[in-house]
UniProtKB/Swiss-Prot annotation:
Pathway: tRNA modification; tRNA-queuosine biosynthesis
Comp. bias regions, Polar residues: 1-13
Function of the molecule: Catalyzes the NADPH-dependent reduction of 7-cyano-7-deazaguanine (preQ0) to 7-aminomethyl-7-deazaguanine (preQ1).
Pfam families attached to this UniProt entry: QueF
Catalytic activity: 7-aminomethyl-7-carbaguanine + 2 NADP(+) = 7-cyano-7-deazaguanine + 2 NADPH + 3 H(+)
A GO CC term attached to the entry: cytoplasm
Name this protein carries in UniProt: NADPH-dependent 7-cyano-7-deazaguanine reductase
Taxon lineage: Bacteria, Pseudomonadati, Pseudomonadota, Alphaproteobacteria, Hyphomicrobiales
Binding annotation for substrate: V78, E79, S80, H97, E98
HAMAP family for this protein: QueF_type1 (MF_00818)
The organism of origin for this protein: Bradyrhizobium sp. (strain ORS 278)
UniProt keyword Membrane present: no
The keyword Oxidoreductase is annotated on this UniProt entry: yes
InterPro entries in the cross-refs: GTP-CH-I_C/QueF, NADPH_dep_7-cyano-7-deazaG_red, QueF, QueF_type1
Annotated keywords: Cytoplasm, NADP, Oxidoreductase, Queuosine biosynthesis
């Protein structure tokens, strides 16, 4: 395998390796991307976010979710620090569960142009009702192994 220069994988504009102020909102958050060195290979990358938070747009109460983001990278990879900051920007953002989940999937798709992406938003109950939200870009690439997202349906104390 050829040795890669560190300069080919980094850019002066990345947030990685720098002290960065948290973004004020998802709309102003910057998502960084880096070139995919395995662009010609179909593979799956997964981000698991067990402590995602946002605010109810009506009551202002906090909402909590376990997010699982699976994607088959195309030309770009999402840089994980910028993803963390982007997701943290929802902490003071008021939106319904469905909107948060789908907006994250669409934003990632627009920024990194994956071959395929899906997001599962497993929201903890509010008002006694758990809400699970699922979104994907289209058909799964042929032959791509995608494990189960591994989040059990909410059962409470049952």
């Amino acid at each position: 395998m050829a040795k890669r220069s560190n300069t080919t994988m980094t850019s002066a504009g990345l947030q990685l390796g720098r002290e960065v102020a948290p973004p004020d909102s998802p709309e102003t958050a910057k998502l960084d991307r880096v070139p995919n060195p395995q662009r010609d290979t179909d593979y799956l990358a997964r981000f698991t976010v067990p402590e995602f938070t946002s605010l109810c747009p009506v009551t202002g109460q906090p909402d909590f979710a376990h997010l699982v983001i699976d994607y088959a990278p195309g030309p770009w990879l999402v840089e994980s620090k910028s993803l963390k900051l982007y997701l943290a920007s929802f902490r003071n953002h008021g939106a319904f569960h469905e909107d948060c989940t789908v907006a994250i999937g669409k934003r990632l798709t627009a920024e990194i142009k994956p071959k395929w992406l899906r997001i599962g938003g497993y929201w903890y109950p509010r008002g006694g009702i758990p809400i699970d939200v699922f979104w994907q870009t289209g058909r799964l690439p042929k032959g791509l192994w995608v494990p189960d997202q591994g989040v059990a349906p909410y059962r409470g104390r049952g």
